């Protein structure tokens, strides 16, 4: 039978043996910059062919990992997979619905990485372990719509019993945070 590890490209089991789940092969060019070539064995899917033969509602693991968070929520909602939705919904809540499920963390901006970390705390829900969060200008580079989601997420952390300190220079955000702290 197949185990969880067969559907992860991070460990041996189901990942492509040739590229070790990277989907690409790095070719050293000695005096020039290295180049990445799509793995010929898995064709960039990162998985062994027998794993790709396994489907959930017509999609294999590679196709699912290429879905954005928003697409995955809709896909799993249609299949009544509430447990999965509960785990990925906080990513949407912090404004990261556009990220692919299998996207490498090395491709994330600093702000995106911060929001992934924030989402990981939101998914935990109420715990006895309380955390002090210090955010240094978390709105940098964010669209106004995403700033609103960020502020909602920070408020959610407070409602879960955590403490939040925000260092910010944008007057609109300072005003909104002040209003939230006065509640």
Question: Which residue ranges define each predicted feature?
Answer:
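Conserved phosphate-binding elements of NTP-dependent enzyme cores
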Residues: 1-183
